[in-house]
Amino acid sequence: MNRQLWCWDIECYVNFFCVTFQDANTGQKHYYEVSSRIDQSKDLRIFLEFLSGYLVSFNGIEYDDIILSYWYQEQPSLQELKAFSDSVINRNEEAYKYYKWLKCFPSLKSIDLFRYWSKMLRLSKKISLKSLGIQLGYHTVQELPYHHTTVLTEDQMEEVKYYNYEHDLNILKLLYEALKDQVELRFSVEEQYKIKCISDDAPKIALKLIGQEIEKHIPDYKDLRTYRPEIKLADILLDYNFTEASMLYKIDKKMVVCSNYYTLYNLLKQQTIKTTTELAYSVILPNPNGTYLKNDHGTGGIHGVTSQKVWKESNTHIIKDYDVSSLYPRTILNNRFIPEHLNPYFYDVYSSIVERRLKAKREKDKVTDATMKIVINGSYGLMGNEYVFLYDLQQVVAT
């Protein structure tokens, strides 16, 4: 489908405001400036009145969309616009909540690529347009030339104009091209499942799709959670016939290091926890060549910890890579590790989603395959998020 998409970005100073729009299909740019040296307000307003389609931004929902809406509706002075911009930067939501979501532009919708990363990942990785520009191999990565409190000279205005028009827009366009398949997937999900998700990360899409199915059985599902004062691991550990071995372990930097899995299993059976941070175990395994492999265990899975080595195939040894297909969903379904407050409906919904994905893969239905994959991969982690309706920490630990 041929959609009109515009990459865009703004800069705001006490005596300078500029915005650049770039046609995502043709690459053509439109630059507008309102400053102490030039006033293109009328031209910008005319452009906006005829503009339609999607505005592609990086953090636009939390900044650019709001600034543009305020400017368009209130026709502020540059000083008033800068003061408003500061309130947005400082997250004074009472001052700007009326201007969110491009409500004054009914023919425009926002696509915020920043939100394609989950909120926790955005914070922990400190994701920025500049850092992504480096990863994408853009030739010039530059910070804003002057602090946003600076009163710009005309020469400085030219620098900021070039920074906005050239580098920021080029990196944003490059990022859009890199994420184009993900953008198109969200368009397909919106059309097929009738949910709004064009600026959602994968976990949010998973929540909306699962919620759509759960709501048929539990209308008030969004308010439900399963809270537990403690989790006895003996109640959720699966039976396993280990070969009996010596119980050997030590404590190293708050981690329990076990000599074998028999020791790990028996220590876990004795433990009662309240949070997942209490699970910190390692197992040391001997390799046939006399070396050792250390496996770290936590709620995030099993991770091998090894020093850097070069491994080569020989006449007697080959290197093989194995992957367990749909490990988490199969573990959840086979053992019914499902949120207690959604029992039994979640099992049926989740099982149906897994089967729909397998069917889509066989039939090469890429949209359904990718959509169901988002739901499947997102569900496990969401069970550990107390702010969403899937929350039941015991199921995260059990899985």
Positions of predicted regions on the chain:
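Conserved acidic
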Residues: 1, 6, 13, 25-62, ...
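Short N-terminal binding/cap micro-motifs at the start of the first secondary-structure element
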Residues: 14-19
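A generic structural motif
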Residues: 20-24
